[in-house]
Regions:
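Contiguous beta-strand segments of beta-sheet-rich domains
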Residues: 11-15, 29-57, 111-116, 131-157, ...
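Short, solvent-exposed loop/linker segments at the N-terminal edge
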Residues: 89-95, 189-195
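Extracellular acidic loop/turn motifs
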Residues: 4-10, 105-111, 206-211
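Short strand-edge motifs at loop-to-beta-strand transitions and within beta-strands
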Residues: 19-21, 28-34, 70, 120-122, ...
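Terminal edge beta-strands and adjacent linker/stalk segments
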Residues: 53-80, 153-180
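Extracellular/surface recognition and adhesion modules
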Residues: 1, 26, 34, 50, ...
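Surface-exposed, proline-enriched loop/turn segments that connect beta strands in immunoglobulin-like
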Residues: 16-18, 84-88, 118-119, 184-188
C-alpha cells in the first residue's frame, strides 16, 4: 500500500482478502505477503483482484483510499483428471451388469457425461465423483457365453483443466443358467394311399449348431 504523503502516525490498511498492511509513521509504503491460490484440477479465474476496504491512522487531514483494485495474474498449472470405468466381474445370464465411471475430484460447473462403447452414457453429477449405468446380460439356451466387454469412448463437461478418458476395456464373465429346450415331433394329419407323410421336428429354442433327430 502506498501513500502520497508520509504517515504522521502508523496507518492500518484493511484489504478485501482479509489481510492488513501497516504503514509506519514517516513512511509512505507498507507490504503484506499472502499465498497465491493453491494448485487444483479445475479451471481457475486466471487473476486475483484485491481492493482496499478501509484505512485508519496517519494523522492526515483527509485520508482517501483508492477504489482501484490491485490485480495479479496467476498462471494456471494444467493438471489432468482421468475418468475410469469399472464393471461387475461376473453376472448370470439375464442378470444386470453395473458400470461405474469414476473421476478423481468432485465435478464442478456442469455434469460430466461419459459415453460407452455399447452406446450407453453415464452422468457424473456436480459435486459427485462417480456415476453408474446398468445393462442386462443376454439369456439364451446355448452352452457357454462370451464375456461382455465395454469401454469409455469419450467424456465431456465439468470444469476440469484437462479431462481425459481411460479407454481400457472392462470385461464381465457371464455364467450359464441352464435352460430346458424341448424337441417335439409332428406329422401330416392325413395322407392318401401312396402319398408322403411329412414329419416336422420343432425346438423351443433356436439351435446353435445343426441338430440331427433320429
Amino acid at each position: 500500500a502506498t501513500l502520497t504523503n508520509p504517515a504522521g502516525t502508523p496507518v492500518t490498511v484493511t484489504l478485501s482478502n482479509g489481510a492488513t498492511i501497516t504503514i509506519d509513521a514517516g513512511k509512505t509504503t507498507g507490504t503484506v505477503t499472502v499465498d497465491a491460490p493453491k494448485d487444483d484440477v479445475y479451471k481457475d479465474a486466471g487473476k486475483v483482484e484485491v481492493t482496499i476496504e478501509g484505512a485508519t491512522g496517519g494523522n492526515f487531514e483527509n485520508l482517501v483510499p483508492s477504489a482501484v483494485p490491485a490485480v495479479t495474474n496467476v498462471t494456471d498449472t494444467i493438471d489432468t483428471s482421468t475418468v475410469k470405468l469399472s464393471a461387475d466381474t461376473s453376472v448370470a445370464e439375464g442378470g444386470t451388469v453395473t458400470y461405474t465411471a469414476t473421476v478423481g475430484a468432485p465435478v464442478t460447473g456442469s455434469p460430466v457425461v461419459v459415453t460407452l462403447a455399447n452406446g450407453q452414457t453415464i452422468t457424473i453429477g456436480v459435486g459427485q465423483t462417480t456415476g453408474t449405468a446398468t445393462a442386462v446380460a443376454a439369456n439364451d439356451a446355448l452352452t457357454g457365453n462370451a464375456p461382455i466387454t465395454n469401454s469409455i469412448t469419450g467424456v465431456t463437461g465439468g470444469n476440469f483443466e484437462d479431462l481425459v478418458a481411460d479407454k481400457t476395456p472392462v470385461s464381465t464373465s457371464v455364467t450359464d443358467v441352464p435352460d430346458t429346450t424341448t424337441l417335439s415331433l409332428s406329422a401330416s394329419n392325413s395322407v392318401a394311399e401312396g402319398g408322403q407323410i411329412t414329419y416336422t421336428a420343432t425346438l423351443t429354442n433356436a439351435a446353435g449348431s445343426p441338430v440331427t433327430v433320429t
